């Protein structure tokens, strides 16, 4: 075999191609690379491209049997990270043919697989991915999307309200159902299974599904509004998960739930297909995300996990609350919130968006703000997230001194007051506390909630309107 030369050669000779013009069909990745001391950035970037595509550590005879130029990943641009020593953003282009159609699992196995244990790198983080329409079109995506969900629920022009039922573990099915009923009757749109409520000895899944369905129908009959409870179908096997989803459909409930990272993308995509085929909405919880996305220099940013979920399928996903966080973090959160909801998102490095993303007609996902929020946060949340969001108050509903239903009333009154104020042209950023105070004058439930959680010392600037 002519021209085969055994031995180890530098990656950059093959995989670093600064002159490469990216194709519209390429999947593009932005990696934050921290090379080991003495490893030049070109070699590190090329190593990432090689190890996440066609390369291996030594030249192999079988390379001659295929066209490497057609299939290899290419590191096409490298830039140093401002303010960091020896850290670079390396841009890698992958040819479309490297990935199985409609499989987030396969995409991640390549792009964030073995390469993350690579010795020449001290650390590696995937910051963003550009998914080309040629690839995204091979996915079903979210079962229904934002507009279809609004039509199913007949709720328009405001964020939706939810509540995670607490204590998350230990209630019997009957008491759990009662807690759901109280919240829904009080004015919430949804109640939620906690992510770790699956099927434990104190409450088996089937009993919970039954009592929660009863709660939904009773609350619907009393309020004249459509209600839902996120029934967590997450299970130890895919078969068991599907069995739970089927039972939910038989009960006629509107929505089920899945923990997509612990459950896995393969299970999630199967469930999303079932949900579209059977008219179920799908709520997604991101338990385990911080294991992957919390380190600044290693792992994968949540915006990548969010894009992956939009491909795999989900109608709601937890996306942080922004409230009380730093300004920069707000921009970055809103960056991936837009990636979840919008059709077309421009590249904007100040919001952490490394690539222009065109989803074409893939349905959007509703971001869910949940965790440590209460009535005083309502103006900020309405302003930051806008109408296409779900605001979830667990303790902020169930912690009300008069009980669950009054807690739900307080949240609904606060929300309606904020939406009305916004529609009248008032500035929620500056008048938020005032709006809540006014509303509490004619709602004793809200007044009691305001008293418990007192005004929070939280001044937030109006967002830059572009």
UniProtKB/Swiss-Prot annotation:
* Primary subcellular site in the record, as a coarse category: plastid
EC assignment? 4.1.1.39
Q: Which terms does the record give in the GO molecular function aspect?
A: magnesium ion binding; monooxygenase activity; ribulose-bisphosphate carboxylase activity
Q: Which residues carry this modification: N6-carboxylysine?
A: 192
Instruction: Give residues where N6,N6,N6-trimethyllysine occurs.
Output: 5
Q: Which residues bind substrate?
A: 114, 164, 168, 286, 318, 370
Pfam families xref list: RuBisCO_large (PF00016), RuBisCO_large_N (PF02788)
Q: Which family does it belong to?
A: Belongs to the RuBisCO large chain family. Type I subfamily.
Q: Which UniProt keywords apply?
A: Calvin cycle, Carbon dioxide fixation, Chloroplast, Disulfide bond, Lyase, Magnesium, Metal-binding, Methylation, Monooxygenase, Oxidoreductase, Photorespiration, Photosynthesis, Plastid
Task: Please state what class of enzyme this protein is.
Answer: lyase
Can you say where in the cell this protein is located? Answer: Plastid, Chloroplast
The cross-references to InterPro entries, in alphabetical order and at most eight, read:
RuBisCO, RuBisCo_large_chain_AS, RuBisCO_lsu_C, RuBisCO_lsu_C_sf, RuBisCO_lsu_fd_N, RuBisCO_lsu_N_sf, RuBisCO_lsuI
Species in which this protein is naturally found: Bixa orellana (Lipstick tree)
Please report the PTM annotation for this entry. The disulfide bond which can form in the large chain dimeric partners within the hexadecamer appears to be associated with oxidative stress and protein turnover.
Q: Which Gene3D superfamilies match?
A: Ribulose bisphosphate carboxylase, large subunit, C-terminal domain, RuBisCO large subunit, N-terminal domain
The protein's job, in short, is:
RuBisCO catalyzes two reactions: the carboxylation of D-ribulose 1,5-bisphosphate, the primary event in carbon dioxide fixation, as well as the oxidative fragmentation of the pentose substrate in the photorespiration process. Both reactions occur simultaneously and in competition at the same active site.
Origin superkingdom: Eukaryota
Could you tell me what this protein is called? Ribulose bisphosphate carboxylase large chain
| Entry cofactors | Mg(2+)
Q: What lineage, starting at the top, does this entry show?
A: Eukaryota, Viridiplantae, Streptophyta, Embryophyta, Tracheophyta
Give additional notes from the record: The basic functional RuBisCO is composed of a large chain homodimer in a 'head-to-tail' conformation. In form I RuBisCO this homodimer is arranged in a barrel-like tetramer with the small subunits forming a tetrameric 'cap' on each end of the 'barrel'.
- Site features described as Transition state stabilizer, chain residue numbers: 325
Gene Ontology CC: one annotated term: chloroplast
Active site, UniProt feature:
166, 285
Q: How does it assemble?
A: Heterohexadecamer of 8 large chains and 8 small chains; disulfide-linked. The disulfide link is formed within the large subunit homodimers.
Gene Ontology annotations of biological process type: photorespiration; reductive pentose-phosphate cycle
